[in-house]
Amino acid sequence: MNGNLPHIQIQSPKNSLDHLNNGRQATHNFEHGKPGDREEANGHADAHSSSGRSRYLSSDTNLLRDGSSSLDPLSKHIMKRTRSEKTLSFLNPSRASSNTHLSREGTNRSSNVTRTVSGRKSNHGSSLTDTGESDQLSLKSFGAIRQPSQHRSSLFSRMLGSTSHIFGIREDMDNESSEEERDGIPRVEGNAADPFSWIPDGKNVWDSPPKYIRVLSHNKKEKSLDHLFLAQELYCKPTLAATHDRYYEPRATDFPNLAHESSEPSSSRHTADAQSITNASVHLHNSSSPLNRTPSVISDTLAVAITSNSSSNSSNNAIWAMKFSRDGRYLAVGGQDRILRIWAVLDSEHARSVASETCSSDPNNPKLNLKAPVFSEAPIREYAGHTADILDLSWSRNNFLLSSSMDKTARLWHPVRKDCLCCFEHSDFVTSIAFHPKDDRFFLSGSLDCKLRLWSIKEKAVSFWNELPELITAVAFSPDGGLAIAGTFVGLCLFYDTRGLRFRTQMSIRSSRGKNAKGSKVTGIQTRTQMIDNIAGDTEMLVTTNDSRIRIYNLRDKSLELKFKGHANAQSQNRAYFDDDGNYVICGSEDHQVFIWDLPPQHMHKTKKKKHEHFKASVRPITAAVFAPTKTKQLLTLSGDPVYLAAISARRSSVISNASIETGPSLRNLKSLSHSYLPIEIMKGHIIVCGDLDGRIRVFRQDSVFAARKLIEKKNIERKNSETLSNSSFFPQALKAHMNSISSPKRHFSLRHKKNASQITNNENNGNDDIKKGDEPEEEHVGLRKNSTQEKNANLDPNEALKRADMMMLQEGASSMVYYSLTNLDNPGATVNEAAKTAATIEQNEHEIQTSVDPISNVKAILPNADDVSSKNSSTEDQLECLRCGNSLFNVFSRSFVFEGAKFSIVCSHCNRKLLKSGSDDGSETHEMSTLP
């Protein structure tokens, strides 16, 4: 069996412990291997296969420093190793048509330039072509991607014409035009949008509303991601010279391949044993290590490499990997500039105020304040430990971060530490990594040496490993961690038991027919467990490939459930991701767009009409796109985020006034918000983060309270029109007819009398029915309310009854396009003062209460009849409610006006508002509607 394995060229440091025994399970007894008897020439070995494996050459050190091409470096190197002429022509279609001289020269090279490495041929007698021509292939503009090939249409399609394609375009355009006509707001392309900003002009009003971007939909009547706007822009800028103290400083001795490349012979830098595997060259940076220190100067090797790279080509900032931490607090970004950056989510009022000051500190910036940021402007950590492109990232449950790179290493980080915690060396490019979902002590790595490794961080060594038949490009775990999955360059997915990495089964990710029937490179794998009514269902596996397709498989029986298309993913490392709720799948596209597909219900998985939405997100190809997790939304809510604050205000019981906008209010009500519950407006307020080929990170947010704001504005207009109606002087008909026309621009805070509804009912029934008309009764405090409300709240807890009364109140006073302002309820000083005044008033009224008189018997004309109480179909015109607060519980006091021999006044028990008062102390009273100051 070992004779059929390919001879793999391994490059490793001189002192690395790469040699293992022949067994598949790794041990700690390492021995230095001896060079084999096979021939070597210029440090390269033959690559041959007898089992249909891909042909590839060993890594070249010069390829690590090649930053001139804008193409995904991993795809470029794999193409060079596999000698895929089809892929090379795919990258530059004009190479054979537009450039005649190059085509003619390429034809001549086909017979002359082909040569072997150091004048030798492979064992199969085929020649290995020169890499000089492929090295010169460079895409100046990655945006000029290959257009879809024009296939010859069939007879049936010629008879039908191209109506289906035309109808599809019309459908998208009609959806967009109807959306603009419906809300009357023009939209711009996402790649031309500016971040939403606010310029204060002294009145605290919005200078201009945010520009919603144009979102196109397919097979959808209503868009799920309408009213998107650009909220923030972040940049991966090379700031090593200015902030070198943020970087981890590796020494030159840590990289013997780069430091001693010119002094040592090439044969001394290679390992001859083809059956050995890189395992234990692990640098643990503990407290005693000299590397665990804050650098005073920048490493010369690293500084020169980064400075020369930045000066020679300023566009080498492409983003290849982007991941949110599991707790939603951090966003890690890595890419072509070799620097790992971590941004923090604004999770407190202080962090948001600091971010606002940072945004407004630039006098040359006309936009002084970004009002909807998600992250801090500057990254909290910038690590420069890697010496080549960063390809993949993985977060653990405890916020440990793993990064894999083309420098043949995987490194361990943590945001609270300024340096690298551990370095795990491999024999080839580490293309993908994944933390174990249940145990942070283990992680899975896949590399281009066709070996799948399960590492133990505690032991700093490989626990298990296995060899695959193809180049590994993606790895993942099952949700329970019992299954390890690896995707290959030819579209093969292999499944292994995590313990021991024993092979279980495999499946081919390819189309049944057409040009993609041979399989394409797997760029990403993600698994999740379906939740149906909070019950765990089947496990799904999301697979992204380079044939511009995204597939969802059932992990139990390996059956294909869904297949999405529409985006362009031919040569990039774009990966598709689920959102937290499992309702959408998101992926970036090489045509500068972001695509979002709807996940249909389980019983509709076989439907052919796949609904999706897409929008242009940048002027460059999108290389990574993710949804912000739900925990990120919770953190933003607690920090006083303006967008989510508006959603919270739309569900609050307080009445929003037309006061000025408070940019930093005291959010005591948001502090008590449960993390397990969020309003539906916040759940629909999606956040999309995408990165492009220029290193620009764009954050798009959804205005989730757009519909609620429009409804409130409409009700405000109706309320203002109702205020012009004249008030009648007759009671109680005036009270019933004009109760709904009472409105106040400001709510008066009061402590509500927390009496149980059942206790109030007993007091009403046990009163004295005999009232002497000649006596002058003391002021009485009784409950007057609708019996239907009494029956509704009779068995409720007082706090629950008050909460329901709050939910009945109507919100009013929209103040801006996107945001609302809080009332004085969010001002602790004003709240305490109002509460103290109201408490004193209630205490004074309670001293005047006497139980000798029952005014209820004298105002029986106002109360509903017993027949009305028992009737379920009572008229709504007889209901008494205070439209200021929506309360139906009133207090009746004496000595206010004369009615059937007694003087009374009706006051709302919730907002302490006097509804009626007498015009004189004698018997001639005038009933008029009035409000308390």
UniProtKB/Swiss-Prot annotation:
Residues 29-47, 769-783 have a biased composition (Basic and acidic residues). InterPro entries: WD40/YVTN_repeat-like_dom_sf (IPR015943), WD40_repeat_dom_sf (IPR036322), WD40_rpt (IPR001680), WDR44/Dgr2 (IPR040324). The modification Phosphoserine is found at S722. It holds the Pfam family WD40. GO terms for cellular component: endoplasmic reticulum membrane; mitotic spindle pole body; nucleus. Gene3D superfamilies: YVTN repeat-like/Quinoprotein amine dehydrogenase. Residues 49-59 have a biased composition (Low complexity). It is found in: Endoplasmic reticulum; Nucleus. Disulfide bonds: none annotated. SMART domains: WD40. Keywords: Endoplasmic reticulum, Nucleus, Phosphoprotein, Repeat, WD repeat. It comes from the Eukaryota. This is Uncharacterized WD repeat-containing protein C3H5.08c.
